């Protein structure tokens, strides 16, 4: 078996990636989320494939085809709710994975980090298009509002929006192309994940101390395969509790009403995992400014290696920046809450304050805190 594992051209690649891979001996459970994201992607592709067998991407039948899946297809209700809540679990793992990367300074592995940002954009695009497919009220109006943002682009905006719509409004052509993109993107994401891993294995994993761990490595299997398995069991347990006991808790009741272009829902809002970005978008009174802030809210992650001023990599031994980090986490939770609230006092001013705080903490306060810590520890 050892001979095949180390000599066979295909199995050799798997061996070097998941079995004999040298891994730091001290990585914590925060390093489990990579494998959990792989599991989430596999669940989404499998459940999505079975849903696509019964779904029809036509405005007249899309809503009823989803109802048909839930009522008439064997375990269709389970597949549908696994897919819908699987997206939420995917984003929970994504946010924790990115948060870990920021906390422990993993953004200093620039190629891996940038590939991760591209992956984040791809997953967000996929999730947005997936939300449109059931063709409920929030699907239709969410698609209308978000695609309409592109009209803020000077000169080509209106033409671009009509080109994406395939007409003068969100309609049959839009739904068909969104289904096509929603189907193909997860496979593109899978390819990007392999590139993400390729870049990661060039440098090796980071660890909680932020120090070089070349002198103290252990094989990935069996140590981290067992450790990842525990994470998998916990995730699956949480996932099945969510899916089987509270399947609609993260959804919007408006999406159980078929799409009606003549009736606007009182509060148009995206799924919970986009609310922080939606709050930042809404907090700027100018349309183009809002769109730029929306994109920058994610793209700012690409600036993190440039904004790193500390002589230490991780926040493990940096109490001032740690405080800034946890304020940032709290700020993101506030933005998520505000994104789901109506546009009225006091939510407008809270959203604007939280949006300013978000960019200020990342671009100004954390770099300054890093420099202060250098001086305190005399690391200049």
From Swiss-Prot:
TM helices/strands, residue ranges: 33-53, 77-98, 113-133, 178-198, 226-246, 288-308, 320-340, 347-367
Full protein name: Cytochrome b
Localization (cell): Mitochondrion inner membrane
Residues involved in heme b b566 binding: 97, 196
Keywords (A to Z) from UniProt: Electron transport, Heme, Iron, Membrane, Metal-binding, Mitochondrion, Mitochondrion inner membrane, Respiratory chain, Transmembrane, Transmembrane helix, Transport, Ubiquinone
Additional information: Heme 1 (or BL or b562) is low-potential and absorbs at about 562 nm, and heme 2 (or BH or b566) is high-potential and absorbs at about 566 nm.
Pfam family, one: Cytochrome_B
General function of this protein: Component of the ubiquinol-cytochrome c reductase complex (complex III or cytochrome b-c1 complex) that is part of the mitochondrial respiratory chain. The b-c1 complex mediates electron transfer from ubiquinol to cytochrome c. Contributes to the generation of a proton gradient across the mitochondrial membrane that is then used for ATP synthesis.
GO cellular component, as recorded: mitochondrial inner membrane; respiratory chain complex III
Topology versus the membrane: Multi-pass membrane protein
Originating organism: Microtus tatricus
Binding positions (heme b b562): 83, 182
Cofactor: record remark: Binds 2 heme b groups non-covalently.
GO BP terms: mitochondrial electron transport, ubiquinol to cytochrome c
Record note on quaternary structure: The cytochrome bc1 complex contains 11 subunits: 3 respiratory subunits (MT-CYB, CYC1 and UQCRFS1), 2 core proteins (UQCRC1 and UQCRC2) and 6 low-molecular weight proteins (UQCRH/QCR6, UQCRB/QCR7, UQCRQ/QCR8, UQCR10/QCR9, UQCR11/QCR10 and a cleavage product of UQCRFS1). This cytochrome bc1 complex then forms a dimer.
Residues annotated as binding a ubiquinone: 201
């Amino acid at each position: 078996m050892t001979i095949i594992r180390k000599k066979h051209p295909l199995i050799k690649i798997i061996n070097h990636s998941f079995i004999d891979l040298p891994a730091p001996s001290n990585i914590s459970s925060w390093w489990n989320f990579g494998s959990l994201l792989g599991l989430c992607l596999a669940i989404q592709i499998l459940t999505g494939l079975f849903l696509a067998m019964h779904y029809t991407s036509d405005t007249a039948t899309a809503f009823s085809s989803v109802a048909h899946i839930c009522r008439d297809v064997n375990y269709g209700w389970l597949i549908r709710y696994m897919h819908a809540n699987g997206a939420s679990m995917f984003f929970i793992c994504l946010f924790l994975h990115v948060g870990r990367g920021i906390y422990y300074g993993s953004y200093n592995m620039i190629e891996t980090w940038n590939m991760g940002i591209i992956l984040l954009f791809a997953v967000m695009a996929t999730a947005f298009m997936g939300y449109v497919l059931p063709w409920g009220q929030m699907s239709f109006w969410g698609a209308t509002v978000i695609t309409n943002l592109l009209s803020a682009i000077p000169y080509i905006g209106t033409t671009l929006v009509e080109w994406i719509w395939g007409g003068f409004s969100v309609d049959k052509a839009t739904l068909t192309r969104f289904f096509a993109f929603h189907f193909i993107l997860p496979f593109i994401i899978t390819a990007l994940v392999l590139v993400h891993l390729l870049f990661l294995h060039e440098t090796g994993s980071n660890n909680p101390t932020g120090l070089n761990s070349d002198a103290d490595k252990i094989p990935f299997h069996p140590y981290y395969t067992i450790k990842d398995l525990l994470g998998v069991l916990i995730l699956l347990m949480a996932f099945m509790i969510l899916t089987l006991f509270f399947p609609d808790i993260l959804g919007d009741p408006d999406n159980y009403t078929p799409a009606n272009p003549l009736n606007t829902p009182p509060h148009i809002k995206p799924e919970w995992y986009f609310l922080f970005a939606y709050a930042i978008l809404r907090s700027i009174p100018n349309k183009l400014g809002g769109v730029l802030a929306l994109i920058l809210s994610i793209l700012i992650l690409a600036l993190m290696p440039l904004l790193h001023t500390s002589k230490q990599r991780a926040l493990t031994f940096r109490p001032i920046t740690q405080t800034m980090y946890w304020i940032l986490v709290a700020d993101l939770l506030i933005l998520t809450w505000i994104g789901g609230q109506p546009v009225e006092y006091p939510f407008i001013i809270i959203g604007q304050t939280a949006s300013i705080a978000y960019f200020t903490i990342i671009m100004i306060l954390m770099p300054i805190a890093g420099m202060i810590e250098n001086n305190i520890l005399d690391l200049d």
